[in-house]
């Protein structure tokens, strides 16, 4: 059986965490992880992976495979295949499909369609019927079908709906996702409000477009109880509000995207459309705060926010 030697195993809690390891592979499946020892045997198919690290499979809590609705952009089968090649063990596809995932049969369908894939699905159901933000979906039936979380893949605009959702889902133990963005605060904004947006002559989105919504949602959580997840946080001020809420004992978790950890609004110079995001890249100070939060426990997840488009 061939061995693949990695510079280190990254798996906190494992006795070999941080140490060089040999990965034993049989029939294209990992069957063992042992301390790196002795010379590798090229005739057996052994390979030295150099500086590569070995990780347990990653989980991506926000990706859109455009299935059903616009499968031409990717589709579930292709998306899960590529996710496996990228090292992801689990993916949570967003519920904003067409039709949206607001019925138990749709949860059962995605579980059935994905069960033969190496990468598994973490089913997310729509929070409101038709994602219209008016009436809650049948949460109990959806949870029984396999839904693990509930999200409209959008901000929950109506405070009363978020309150009822947190109260009801608190009894089920399922988290409610609410996007940290107030679309009515600066509806014309298309990038972070700052020096870069001024130089480029583009309308900005201030940090308040995020922090006003985070503080409102935390106030509702404080009143209603339940579990709140904020999928993408982009600002230092928003992170601080969540950090304070966690210290207070509120059941809130949050994430950010890999894009927000890597780039800033200054990288849009030259009008780079590839970095124009609906939740915009922020300042260098915000990026530093996000990186710090990834290590101090404030951030609970880093997501791909993978959303393929057709050429049209």
Residue ranges, per PLM feature:
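Metal-cofactor-binding active-site regions of metalloenzymes
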Residues: 60-63, 67, 71, 86-106, ...
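Divalent metal-coordination and catalytic microenvironments
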Residues: 7, 28, 51, 62, ...
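Catalytic pocket of metal/acid-base enzymes, prominently hydrolases
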Residues: 52, 77-91, 108-120, 162-197, ...
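Histidine/acidic residue-rich metal-binding segments in metalloenzymes
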Residues: 137-302
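Short, acidic/polar
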Residues: 72-80, 131-141
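Active-site anion/phosphate-binding pocket segments in diverse small-molecule metabolic enzymes
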Residues: 304-311
């Amino acid at each position: 059986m061939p061995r693949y030697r990695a510079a280190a195993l990254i798996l906190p809690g494992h006795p070999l965490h941080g140490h060089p390891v040999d990965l034993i592979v049989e029939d294209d499946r990992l069957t063992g992880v042992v301390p790196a020892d002795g010379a590798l045997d090229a005739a057996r198919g052994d390979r030295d992976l150099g500086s590569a690290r070995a990780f347990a499979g990653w989980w991506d809590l926000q990706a859109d495979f455009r299935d059903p609705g616009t499968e031409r952009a990717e589709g579930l089968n292709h998306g899960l295949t590529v996710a496996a090649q990228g090292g992801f063990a689990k993916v949570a596809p967003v519920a904003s499909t067409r039709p949206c995932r607001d019925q138990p049969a749709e949860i059962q369908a995605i579980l059935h369609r994905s069960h033969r894939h190496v990468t598994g699905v973490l089913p997310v159901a729509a929070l409101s019927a038709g994602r219209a933000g008016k009436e809650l979906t049948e949460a109990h039936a959806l949870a029984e079908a396999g839904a693990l979380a509930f999200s409209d893949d959008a901000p929950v605009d109506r405070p009363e709906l978020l309150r009822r959702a947190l109260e009801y889902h608190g009894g089920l133990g399922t988290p409610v996702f609410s996007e940290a963005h107030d679309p009515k605060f600066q509806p014309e904004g298309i990038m972070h409000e700052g020096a870069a947006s001024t130089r480029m002559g583009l309308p900005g989105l201030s940090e308040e477009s995020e922090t006003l919504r985070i503080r409102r949602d935390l106030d509702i959580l404080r009143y209603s109880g339940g579990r709140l997840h904020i999928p993408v946080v982009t600002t230092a001020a928003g992170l601080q509000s969540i950090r304070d809420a966690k210290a207070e004992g509120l059941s809130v978790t949050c994430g950010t995207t890999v894009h927000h950890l890597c780039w800033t609004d200054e990288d849009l110079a030259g009008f780079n459309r590839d970095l124009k995001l609906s939740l915009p890249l922020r300042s260098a100070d915000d990026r530093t705060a996000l990186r710090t939060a990834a290590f101090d426990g404030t951030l609970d997840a880093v997501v791909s926010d993978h959303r393929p488009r057709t050429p049209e």
